[in-house]
Design a protein with these regions (language model features):
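Flexible, non-catalytic linker and terminal segments flanking ANL/adenylate-forming cores
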Residues: 1-25
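Conserved AMP-binding/adenylate-forming core of the ANL superfamily
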Residues: 17, 36-91, 95-99, 116-121
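Structural alpha-helical scaffold elements that stabilize or flank donor/cofactor-binding regions
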Residues: 30, 123-125
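Flexible acidic/glycine-rich loop/turn elements at helix↔coil and beta-strand↔loop transitions
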Residues: 30-36
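Anion (oxyanion) recognition and catalysis
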Residues: 102
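Short beta->alpha connector loops at strand-helix junctions that form conserved
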Residues: 111-114
């Protein structure tokens, strides 16, 4: 499903502000150019958001982590064009999930962490 009208797509493409590159294409380019540069860093208050020590991933590490998660997701039955709701705090693993799901061609529907069972149940119908 595309939600952007064709005329708007044409408008932005003609101005060079919208292209054919995907999220994963941008990651692959950074892995080629600067694999050891930091790509994503946990917030200082990670411990308030979730368990575990703060993480830092380079572009190469982010690519490898998202590849590994994508393979796990395939094993769990997640497939191309499937819709997945994702509810996570703003931590490194969220970025890994987005890239893994994008590599599989999955449609991601992010949910605010404040949503509880009622909201999630309603949205999943």
């Amino acid at each position: 499903m595309y939600t952007t009208p064709d005329h708007r797509i044409t408008h932005w493409v003609n101005r060079g502000l919208w292209g054919d590159r995907t999220l994963c294409d941008h990651l692959a380019l950074q892995v080629d150019i600067r694999p050891q540069q930091l790509a994503v860093i946990d917030p200082a208050n990670r411990i308030e958001l979730t368990q575990g020590d703060p993480l830092r991933l380079t572009y190469a590490e982010l690519d490898a982590a998202s590849d590994a998660l994508a393979l796990d997701l395939i094993d769990w039955g997640v497939s191309h064009r499937q819709r997945v709701m994702l509810q996570m705090p703003n931590v490194v693993e969220l970025v890994v999930c987005y890239f893994a799901l994008s590599k599989l061609g999955v449609v991601v529907s992010p949910l605010p962490v404040q949503y509880q069972a009622h909201e999630i149940s309603t949205l999943s119908k």
